[in-house]
Amino acid sequence: MSFSSTAKAEVSKKLSQNSCCARAAAAAFLKFTGNIYELDGTFSFKTSFENAQTARSFFLLMKNGFSKHCEVSIKKNSKLQKNYVYTIFLPPSSDNIGVLKDLHFVRKGAKEYHLSFSLKEELVRKKCCRKAFLQATFLSCGSITNPEKMYHLEFDVKTKDDAEFLQKVLKSFEFEAKIVERKSHYVVYLKEGDRIVDFLNIIGAHSSLLELENIRIVKELRNNVNRLVNCETANLEKTINASMRHIENIEFIERTIGIENLPQNLQEIARLRIKYKDASLKELGNMLEKPLGKSGVNHRLRKIDKIAEELRKGGVVHAKPSHED
């Protein structure tokens, strides 16, 4: 089972059954997975789910929260023959108007009620109701990409109004969700791993939260190791390139004016550099008659580089034997 499916199975078991929260959750389920039908003053609705536990949660929500007994049908997914689609249907009845009134999906006209299938602020005034709304929204149209690959949580909704309503609910929990239009739908998404962890905490998916945190820790450790290896490799390459440059410059000086014409202090380090090509700067410094640290050795070698550069330009180097740096 995918990470997203596992998280949904966990949330399905924790869907709130409180009356106010039940209204917020039912509204999200119907809005994002269902359709409402109106015929001769009667109303019915149908929702479809690919997750059996989510379908069961909605069925129980209607039964316990609204005293409605829905019909359930199961058939194979036409696109994915291995999966099933669970359809929950509430048959037409004038009594169903009460449910839709609770969900603010109908408005009263001069003589009768009319369908108004849009989400209302009244549903999510309380924090507990906003949590229930997010639980049902995640179960209905949410998905989380495999965190081993990337951090991405998204909700696929039909209209811009739905996307902005969801964005506003997420904003109440300090989530800065983005909206992007994708073909005929709108996608509300979060990309930061720590924010997805916070979202899982809010909807009660604590086991999935811990799994994601473990994945994040391993990925961060792996990235740190790779960064360290890359840094060490870069430093090693830099050291090797510098050593090769020094040797090349010293050999050039030997062919032109001769190492013996360098100041005494530079002669000493030049001969050691040629003799011990693989030695580090620290090792070279310890070999000197008067030992030097890495920075002192590097300073002398840079002087040799400068002399070689002047010689290549055709300049004249007046070497003065010296023990000074």
Swiss-Prot record:
Disulfide bonds: none annotated. One of its GO terms (molecular function) is DNA binding. Residues 280-313 bind DNA. The keyword Manganese does not apply. SUPFAM superfamilies: Homing endonucleases. Pfam families: HTH_WhiA (PF02650), LAGLIDADG_WhiA (PF14527), WhiA_N (PF10298). Transmembrane segments: none annotated. The keyword Cell division applies. One of its GO terms (biological process) is regulation of sporulation. InterPro entries: Homing_endonucl (IPR027434), Sporu_reg_WhiA_N_dom (IPR018478), Sporulation_regulator_WhiA (IPR003802), Sporulation_regulator_WhiA_C (IPR023054), WhiA_LAGLIDADG_dom (IPR039518). Keywords: Cell cycle, Cell division, DNA-binding. Belongs to the WhiA family. PANTHER family: CELL DIVISION PROTEIN WHIA-RELATED (PTHR37307:SF1). Involved in cell division and chromosome segregation. HAMAP family: HTH_type_WhiA. This is Probable cell division protein WhiA. The lineage of its organism: Bacteria, Bacillati, Bacillota, Bacillota incertae sedis, Caldicellulosiruptorales.
